[in-house]
Amino acid sequence: IPGSQGSLDVLTERDIKFVEFAAHNDIDYLGLSFVREASDVVKLRELLHSHGNTTARIISKIEKPQAVNNIDAIIEVSDGIMVARGDLGIEISNEKVPIVQKTIIRKANTKRKVVIVATQMLDSMIENPIPTRAETSDVANAILDGTDAIMLSGETAAGAYPVEAVAMMKKIADNVEESPFMRKNKFPRKMIEEEKDSQAMAIGMSIADMARKMNVKAVIALTGSGFTASMLAEGKLNIPIFACCPSKNICRDIKLYRGVFPYIVDFDASIDKESLKQMDEFLMKSMKLEDGDLVLVTGSVPELLVGGTNFIKIHEIGKLKRQENAQK
């Protein structure tokens, strides 16, 4: 019933069995439906931990008015947020959904949490090969709001044009990201205010400034926990963030962040000469960068510390090797 508080447990017996299966099968993300308060998320995390899984991430689906009222606390304990507009529109009325969507995206961005906008994005493409103009604008505005991901549901699950729907969504996203209206190389103001004394935030803002002013092709984030890459993602950089991670779990964790392309690396994540030469080979082979390209390298030294981002290096790919060859 729309607007009702409801007293049912957020996890049914069937859900608990699914969670047990997920915990033992290396699942990256679980979506928790009909979250009402932070304790619902905590309960799911404790259940995962009871099965020995401490790596699966939780996406809280915001579908109830109670969740909207408790959004700050829910964001704090979640790994990501999904604005599930279908049920949310029934619960709080359609005209309120756009402002709620913008508010949630902004709050999630500020806290460096993945945010997904979903439901009825290209709904008419369930039956038609092209979307309505209103749907196109809806997808575009979600991207302009700052969402990390846009999601199809019925369009691909049961629609007559699933491939066309995905292609259309990508076409809209590409067009929006090239537009002058897209926030680029700029962190959310509230995030800057809340982290004004953060060393990592200062480095992130410097990288955003360099990305805007210099002809750099990418940021190389040497990250042990995913922190550096997730922080940079909120700056909406106009260049890709190639995250070099020590494990597949970290890579998979951060893949949902906007503009982040994670890779498992087998070289030392440091900035000594030999490591940089290894990195150059990797960048040209795996990331399609070229000899002579400028990139920004960031991370923490002397070792990969969680949240310890403490350096930026302007690096020219191939320069070290060329210098060595010239000295022979």
Please provide the spans of the model-predicted regions.
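Non-catalytic helical/linker scaffolds that mediate oligomerization, partner binding
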Residues: 1-328
